[in-house]
């Protein structure tokens, strides 16, 4: 057979629309995509999602193993902690009914704090002599391991459900959300070494700024795991508030504010916190704003806003922008270097918005792991 004289025009009948081979080449793919298009797309997408699920599974197991190893090495439990830890990892929280929104915040606060108290007491039961520093580390590591396990379970459930029903539209939302889920999961996994070592994370920049201002000042505990110091600046009284470091905790600034307001008159509140940057924004950039700069599910912010409204206290905020990964992993040099600049901006904000003789509360918001005062 002479392949040098092969005539493609004759084979595909480029000039003849009635050629059967040419018609088959066009019609067969159309039929396949009409009747099996979703299934083909499902198979293609499934490969990408399977890789993500495999990663989530490895993150889940790695965080669990690191938590158990840390407890065995640092808490010296009397009994094997594996069964109790596995039970903790499967714990869930049912949020209160919100059909009637009246009083929902108090219910959520009660539910969340009850869970926190329960976890703290049961972790402490592993080793009653455990220091508060080690206790907060284990609590944070437990939350990370529990969150990674929940990520894995939800993604795996959605994937298996779509695959079982051959339902491509059901898998589309998962395909779109998976990159964001993986970004959070990878950040949590990379946060474990810093938290185990008791090193500062990006979210602690607010605590770091206020912690430096507290140095050589007398401190007092005004709320659970929350400390207060008093100082003066240009004939203005400053109240400095942050979570009690170097424990891995965010404290309870709203309860502390309630205590302070009951004893002293405040003329302004300045809150310093980390904030998620938008794509295209520079990491470690500083921005000023108005309103309560504090994350979480909203309980603390609601309480702070309510107290400020009742007492007619304006709330100013300064945030240091960073990515999700930077916020929960070891604090970068770029973010840490902004602490002094933020402090100078705080002083400038005090000059611009208060008069001599007035009082200002400065709250360093965020996880204070590795940050003293």
What do the PLM-derived regions correspond to, one by one?
Residues 136, 146, 150-153, 200, ...:
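Conserved active-site and cofactor/substrate-binding residues in soluble primary-metabolism enzymes
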Residues 44-208:
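Electropositive, gly/pro-rich neighborhoods at or near active sites that engage anionic ligands
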Residues 1-17:
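Short, strongly hydrophobic alpha-helical membrane anchors
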Residues 2-3, 22-25, 221-232, 344:
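…; additionally, a secondary subgroup of soluble metalloenzymes is captured
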Residues 172-290, 311-314:
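Glycine- and small hydrophobic-enriched segments that form the cores of compact globular domains
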Residues 287-307:
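Gly/Ser/Thr-rich active-site loops/lids in small-molecule metabolic enzymes
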Residues 315-373:
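C-terminal functional extensions of proteins
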Residues 21-38, 210:
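Alpha-helical membrane-embedded segments
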């Amino acid at each position: 057979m002479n392949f040098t004289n092969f005539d493609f025009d004759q084979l595909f009948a480029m000039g003849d629309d009635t050629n059967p081979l040419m018609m088959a080449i066009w019609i067969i793919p159309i039929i396949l995509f009409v009747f099996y298009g979703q299934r083909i797309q499902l198979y293609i997408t499934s490969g990408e999602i399977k890789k993500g699920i495999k990663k989530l599974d490895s993150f889940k197991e790695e965080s669990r193993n690191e938590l158990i190893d840390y407890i065995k090495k640092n808490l010296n439990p009397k009994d094997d902690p594996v069964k109790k830890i596995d039970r903790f990892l499967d714990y869930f929280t049912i949020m209160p009914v919100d059909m009637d929104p009246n009083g929902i915040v108090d219910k959520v606060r009660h539910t969340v704090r009850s869970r926190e108290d329960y976890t703290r007491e049961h972790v402490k039961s592993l080793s009653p002599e455990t220091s508060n520093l080690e206790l907060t580390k284990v609590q944070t590591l437990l939350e990370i391991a529990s969150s990674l396990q929940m990520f894995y379970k939800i993604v795996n459930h959605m994937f298996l459900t779509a695959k079982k029903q051959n339902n491509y539209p059901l898998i589309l939302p998962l395909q779109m959300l998976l990159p964001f889920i993986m970004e959070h999961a990878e950040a949590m996994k990379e946060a474990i070494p810093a938290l185990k070592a008791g090193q500062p994370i990006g979210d602690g920049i607010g605590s770091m700024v206020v912690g430096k201002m507290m140095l050589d000042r007398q401190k007092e505990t005004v709320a659970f795991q929350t400390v207060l110091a008093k100082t003066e600046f240009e004939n203005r009284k400053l109240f400095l508030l942050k979570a009690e470091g170097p424990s891995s905790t965010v404290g309870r600034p709203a309860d502390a504010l309630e205590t302070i307001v009951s004893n002293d008159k405040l003329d302004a509140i300045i809150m310093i916190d980390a904030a998620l940057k938008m794509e295209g924004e520079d990491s470690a950039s500083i921005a000023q704003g108005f309103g309560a700069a504090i994350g979480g599910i909203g309980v603390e912010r609601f309480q702070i806003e309510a107290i400020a409204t009742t007492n007619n206290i304006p709330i100013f905020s300064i945030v240091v922008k960073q990515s999700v990964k930077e916020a929960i992993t070891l604090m970068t040099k770029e973010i840490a270097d902004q602490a002094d600049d933020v402090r100078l901006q705080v002083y400038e904000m005090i000059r611009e918005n208060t008069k001599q003789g007035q009082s200002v509360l400065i709250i360093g918001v965020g996880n204070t792991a590795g940050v003293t005062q």
